[in-house]
Amino acid sequence: MIELFYEYMFPLTVIALKVVAITIPLILCVAYLTYAERRVIGLMQLRRGPNVVGPFGLLQPIADAVKLLFKEPIIPTNADKILFILAPIITFVLSLIGWAVIPFAKGVVLADINVGVLYILAISSLSVYGIIIAGWASNSKYAFLGAIRSSAQMISYEVSIGLVIVTVLLTTGTLNLSRIIEAQKTLPWWIDLMLLPMSIVFFISVLAETNRLPFDLPEAESELVAGYNVEYSSMGFALFFLGEYANMILVSAMTTTFFLGGYLPPFNLPFLDCIPGFFWFVLKVMLLLFCFLWIRATLPRYRYDQLMRLGWKVFLPLTLFGVVLVSSVLFYTDNLPSV
């Protein structure tokens, strides 16, 4: 019996504890990211933001969660009820399981697999299905049009994201995210400089991938009322909401891992090694999240034709050229990584 416990139950218990240790703090971060967004945008617009519920409004996310929890879930009469309920669950779960391969610090990762990049790309591709199912199951023209827009937008920019990641893989020679971070310790400065335009394209593309301003066309209120989640209320709406903000944090962590050295100190300065890597990882993610909020507060929304033109006629040729340029430079300077 004891052997059975140590062989089967103990590993499963450890995995469950790791999942809980990541999921609960992540949900809290998502909740308070909404608070930070409202406060930051409020300050940028010369107003206070939420400041009534609790000291400095710190209990506002909890109040919002309680309100949504006790609201009546309304399902449209002609909706496909099973798919209608399933869609927000799919979206929220996919936004969480992507964190399994993200290294928070050296050796601190839930699943240190050798195909971590492929895992991330697969999860980001699957998230389209939750949105399509929501638009279809709602039996609403507004929701369906918002879902079609969102899926077309996400698929379009996934191409650019994938090609940018290829340039990173060319310089590091591995699909393991922990090894990608460690490889950035020894990269020459000119390779980092060569990847700088690619990192900018990547960040703009993940803005479109997460449906954030200036690319929040699926939620264009003047055209689609509220997008693919127009028929959702109560916890269904809350799960979509949490999924969107969890994806914001996830893509910020991906950008940190691929281009900012992950948990490594800035510029790989040796005297900063005494500070835990987790601190640097969180700091870099927070700076990128601030950029998300800053962009939302300052930029107007693109038209849909401008959005698609940017993805297919600007970013796709640019990233293809980037892949050819990076591979050629690495080949002729004999800096291709040995696999």
Curated annotation (Swiss-Prot):
Keywords: Cell inner membrane, Cell membrane, Membrane, NAD, Quinone, Translocase, Transmembrane, Transmembrane helix, Ubiquinone. InterPro entries: NADH_UbQ_OxRdtase_su1/FPO, NADH_UbQ_OxRdtase_su1_CS. It is a multi-pass membrane protein. The chain crosses the membrane at residues 10-30, 50-70, 82-102, 115-135, 155-175, 187-207, 235-255, 275-295, 311-331. It catalyses: a quinone + NADH + 5 H(+)(in) = a quinol + NAD(+) + 4 H(+)(out). It holds the Pfam family NADHdh. GO terms for molecular function: NADH dehydrogenase activity; oxidoreductase activity, acting on NAD(P)H, quinone or similar compound as acceptor; quinone binding. NDH-1 shuttles electrons from NADH, via FMN and iron-sulfur (Fe-S) centers, to quinones in the respiratory chain. The immediate electron acceptor for the enzyme in this species is believed to be ubiquinone. Couples the redox reaction to proton translocation (for every two electrons transferred, four hydrogen ions are translocated across the cytoplasmic membrane), and thus conserves the redox energy in a proton gradient. This subunit may bind ubiquinone. NDH-1 is composed of 14 different subunits. Subunits NuoA, H, J, K, L, M, N constitute the membrane sector of the complex. Belongs to the complex I subunit 1 family. PANTHER family: NADH DEHYDROGENASE SUBUNIT 1 (PTHR11432), NADH-UBIQUINONE OXIDOREDUCTASE CHAIN 1 (PTHR11432:SF3). This is NADH-quinone oxidoreductase subunit H. It comes from Rickettsia typhi (strain ATCC VR-144 / Wilmington).
